[in-house]
């Protein structure tokens, strides 16, 4: 399941957001904000390959959605002066789909496969040989009369992106020469992202307003940029177009994003967990019924951030509200309420 894209605090792209997202993408490692260790490592990989006149090792980018994996893939191709071919794991259902794409590559091309953990097994097995030996074996015919025809593939660099690195098979993961994990952003880094985006979009953003938006953005640049556009709309309609801290706070209140970045659904989960079930433990299915959502939505959409924020703890018996959750809802934690990290 992918995260619902109708929430302002969803890290997934919303419908119609792609074109805006592209306009804000950095074009080089120098422009890319945040992830300093990953940027330094990629710079070495890229410069080393350019000095040798060859192709870099295959690169795996892992981490939560909305942190810039696709942007980095585009930057890698640009820094290498190579063409970028883009596809996704779900689009590669058959080995023939992958063979057709590989056969069209030219030397030094960068092939980007998003959600690579969702690639179908037949295509994945073909990818092994292409990554290792730059060739594929295409099977022609069926049954005893089938024959395998080897096809050469131009030397290329595969950049794979995944939000679930643990879902990759061992053989596929082992064929990546370089793996980088991307972490959530610090508020100060998001302030820089917002300042850059505001400049591109022609938005007058006060420094304190940027800080207000940044701390509600769940450590995710995509969410920060989305909230910036929401606040811009509010500023243009109900203020003088200038985004001050007060304007940002008023706008985000309208859009139901609180000071920690929680929205209505997040607070509904916390409210049910505390008010209806006394803080837990309670199973995900029961919790989902209480908030009128599917269990997968609660587990995959709400829970990761609530756990990371220290408001919900996973235990063998179910989910438990921490003292921070009670406090955030304006209630006094009961005696014995768990502290963040107790069950981690």
Curated annotation (Swiss-Prot):
A single GO molecular function term of this UniProt record: four-way junction helicase activity
Keyword NADP: no
Subcellular location: Cytoplasm
Source superkingdom: Bacteria
Catalytic activity from the UniProt record: ATP + H2O = ADP + phosphate + H(+)
UniProt-listed InterPro entries: AAA+_ATPase, AAA_lid_4, DNA_helicase_Holl-junc_RuvB, P-loop_NTPase, RuvB-like_N, RuvB_C, WH-like_DNA-bd_sf, WH_DNA-bd_sf
A cellular-component GO term for this protein: Holliday junction resolvase complex
Region (Large ATPase domain (RuvB-L)): 1-185
Quaternary structure note: Homohexamer. Forms an RuvA(8)-RuvB(12)-Holliday junction (HJ) complex. HJ DNA is sandwiched between 2 RuvA tetramers; dsDNA enters through RuvA and exits via RuvB. An RuvB hexamer assembles on each DNA strand where it exits the tetramer. Each RuvB hexamer is contacted by two RuvA subunits (via domain III) on 2 adjacent RuvB subunits; this complex drives branch migration. In the full resolvosome a probable DNA-RuvA(4)-RuvB(12)-RuvC(2) complex forms which resolves the HJ.
Family matches, as HAMAP family: DNA_HJ_migration_RuvB (MF_00016)
Protein name (record): Holliday junction branch migration complex subunit RuvB
Organism listed in the record: Mycobacterium tuberculosis (strain ATCC 25177 / H37Ra)
The encoding gene: ruvB
